[in-house]
Amino acid sequence: MLLNEKNSRLTLCGELALLVAVIINSFSVVLMLYSGSGISAISSVPFAFSEAFPKLTLGTWTYIFQGLLIASLMYLRKKFIASYMFSFVVGFVFSQFLDLFELYINMLPQAFSWRVLYFIVSYILICIGIALSNRCGLPIIPTDLFPRELSAIIKIEYAKIKITFDVTCLAITALLTLFLLGHIDGLGIGTILAAFTMGKGVAYAGQYLDKNFHFMPYLQKN
C-alpha cells in the first residue's frame, strides 16, 4: 500500500483488490437473496437451474454459467485468450464462496427491517465489488468480465451493456423458472431495481475509486 505522490492517490495491490472483490461479491449475492428482495441479476440464471435441478448447488451452476460466458467471449474474439482461463479459475473460487456463505447466512436475523438493510448493503457492496474488479488489473470473474469485454468488443459504453446484460439474465430466469418450476422464482422488486440501476451504481463507485486509488498487480512489478 503506497501513496502515489504525483496525484495523491493510494496505490493498492491488485491481487488483494481482486480477492476482496470476489469475497464481497459472493457474500452480497447470497445476502441479496436472503433479504427476500430477489437474487442479483448476475446469479439469477444459475439460481434458476439450482432451484429446478437441486442436485447441483448454486455455486456449481454458477461455475457452469460462467464457463458458457467465457466460451461466448472467445467466440466473439475469434481467438483463444489466456487471461479468460484465469478468469474461469477466479470464477470457480467465487462459486465456492457462494456455497460457503449459503451455509451460514441463516444465522442472520430475518425481521423485515433487517431484510431491507440487507438489500441496501448488498446492492452497495455489489456495485463496489464490480467496480473494484474492473480496476484491479487482473482477470476477474466471468459474470463481471463478460459485460466489460462485450463493451470493448462492440464499442458501446459499459453502463448500457451492464444494464442490458442484467435485464437479459432476469428475462431468461423468469422464463426458466416459469417453464421448469411452473412459477416465476427468485425475482423480486429488489432484483428489478438493481438490474435497471446497477450499471450506473457501478459507474459511480468506479469514479470514486479512480479519484482516490490506483491498483497495481504485484505480478506486474516483477
Q: What residue spans do the PLM features occupy?
A:
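Core subunits and conserved enzymes of cellular information-processing
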Residues: L2-N222
